[in-house]
Each structure stands twice: as C-alpha cells, then as structure tokens.
Amino acid sequence: MRVLHVYKTYYPDTYGGIEQVIYQLSQGCARRGIAADVFTFSPDKETGPVAYEDHRVIYNKQLFEIASTPFSLKALKRFKQIKDDYDIINYHFPFPFMDMLHLSARPDARTVVTYHSDIVKQKRLMKLYQPLQERFLASVDCIVASSPNYVASSQTLKKYQDKTVVIPFGLEQHDVQHDSQRVAHWRETVGDNFFLFVGAFRYYKGLHILLDAAERSRLPVVIVGGGPLEAEVRREAQQRGLSNVVFTGMLNDEDKYILFQLCRGVVFPSHLRSEAFGITLLEGARFARPLISCEIGTGTSFINQDKVSGCVIPPNDSQALVEAMNELWNNEETSNRYGENSRRRFEEMFTADHMIDAYVNLYTTLLESKS
C-alpha cells in the first residue's frame, strides 16, 4: 500500500499541529510496512521526493499566497503526474488549493479527508470558496473528524455524516530521560510550579484572556511559542507589568517536555472554533498534568473532561480562567487527581498507535471495497 498526504506546509518549514499529525501518520505507516509520502508547498524550494526520516516529502514552490493559502500552477501538473502512484490519497483540510488539485486530477486512488477544522475567519472569501468546497467534500470517499464533538457542532460536516468517521489524534508515548542539567536550568529559570501555555500566537488562542487572568491572579505563567501575534502579546504583557509571566520563545521538544513535567497545570484558553482539537492538551495529558480549556464545541472538550481531567470553562472569560487556575493552585490533591485521570484517558484513547491503527484499518477497508 502507498499513501500520499496532501497539505499546504510541512516540516521543516513549519511545525504546527496538522504537520505533527501528518508526521505521526507517515512514520507510523512506515513502521507497518506502508510507504508514505507528503505532497506540500514551500516558499523557497521545489524538490523531492526527498527522505524525511522514514517517509518522503515532495515540495512544491508556491507561486503566490492568498489568505494563508499557497498556489502553484506547477503543482497542478505535478499532482496529475504522480496521482496514480498511490493507493490512498489523504487530504488534510482546510486547504482550498488542495480542492483544485483533487478536482482537476480526479485520482483513481481511494480518497480520505482528515477534517482538521471548519474555516472560521475568512467569511467573505468563504462565500466564493463554498461551491468548490462542497464539490470537493462530496467527491471524496471518506471524511475523518478528530472528535464526536466536532462532528456534532460543525455545520459543514452535518452534510456528510453518512461518510464521516471519528478517529482521535494521538501522540507517541514519552519515556525519555531528561538531561539533568537542562532540568536544573529550567527549574532555576521558571521554578517548578507554574501554569504552562504552549502554542502558536494566533487570533483564536485566547492569549489576551490568559494575560488578563495572569494580571488578576498574579499566579506564575510560562508561555512557550511564537507566531503572528508574538510582538503584540509581549508588548501587552510588558505594558501591564506582568512580572509573573515568562516568555520562552520557540523551544525544542526536550525543553518543552521538561516544562510539561515541571508545571502545575496546562492552560489552553482558545476561545474560537478555529481550535478544532488541541494537541497541547494531549501533550499535557501525556505528562499527567491537569488541564484547563474552554467549551467551544470542538475536540478540546473531548480531550479534557470537566472535573475529571481538569476544568472546562466558558470561552473568553478571564475570571472563569482565574477561578480554574486557583482551583488547581490551592488544591494539590484535586490537581493530582485530575492529572492522573488525564494520563489514563491519554493511554486509553489518544496514543499514536491507536490513531495509526485506526487509519490503517480505514485505508484497508476502502481498498477492499474498491476491489
């Protein structure tokens, strides 16, 4: 079996949650004897297929970009040339140019859409794009959502429930022993009792809510990551005089995992539906940390269950966030219980092996139905 994943960006150009899912699937398939390639776009290179660990990547140099969507006329031709080399083509939605790739090439392979998120922000462009989106989603064989919560709340997915299945995203188990000097460095830098945010600085991440809660509570907060709003968020923290907030910038996995181990709990204040799942919540659960997230009708509340693995609060409510942080800060027994439950739920539902096995079973079923 040969599988092709299609998405707008990939390692090492970007390291977002969708890229992480594609990486896990590609590596996991390779371990199971299934060849996996990634068809993606880059601002500065056109090459491939090139080896990336145990899978391969095909990079297409983008010609221009509109609304965070890269376009390439050469990619249309290239996709048509290679489409018949694969048994399964797994598209990762949303990426509007991908719809054009599919509909122009009409591959004979079985087609799967991993539906990461509704399109939330570009409402005006959505009116132009919607007919193309509907043709694309109607034409594929199967749609995979990451949580039943998202299937129930997505107006788009309601139209395709007859071919939509749920496969939660997963992460590898983590048994790495950390370098004692790095642990000592971070313990000296940020302590070992703080609330941890990890993620891109984007409009839907709720960072303004987190800064407001940090100002009200004066509890220690460590913010890991970067992105389009980084300068704005750092400036706001400085203007508020938030000495209890530490920005680390982007970190490698080892340093990030040390902070997960040192923190009191994970805060995930995303307040808009653009946050479809929440890989950071899985990372926190993997390290048996209590979680704080918002009820936005997506996978965040599938991962984090209120009063079981942490606190689920109303979105865009900094006072509710303060109260949740205080609950974990002032009640160590409760905090530990939530953390144990989050780890148990991770092991039962959210490991990479669970996800990969489910996808391989889906691929196999689709191929058997074709024959």
From Swiss-Prot:
GO terms for molecular function: glycosyltransferase activity. Pathway: Bacterial outer membrane biogenesis; LPS O-antigen biosynthesis. It catalyses: N-acetyl-alpha-D-glucosaminyl-di-trans,octa-cis-undecaprenyl diphosphate + GDP-alpha-D-mannose = alpha-D-mannosyl-(1->3)-N-acetyl-alpha-D-glucosaminyl-di-trans,octa-cis-undecaprenyl diphosphate + GDP + H(+). GO terms for biological process: O antigen biosynthetic process. Keywords: Glycosyltransferase, Lipopolysaccharide biosynthesis, Transferase. Changing E283A: No effect on activity. Mannosyltransferase involved in the biosynthesis of the repeat unit of the lipopolysaccharide (LPS) O-antigen region. Catalyzes the transfer of a single alpha-(1->3)-linked mannose residue to the acceptor N-acetyl-glucosaminyl-diphospho-undecaprenol during the synthesis of the adapter region. Belongs to the glycosyltransferase group 1 family. Glycosyltransferase 4 subfamily. This is O-antigen chain mannosyltransferase C. It comes from Escherichia coli. The lineage of its organism: Bacteria, Pseudomonadati, Pseudomonadota, Gammaproteobacteria, Enterobacterales.
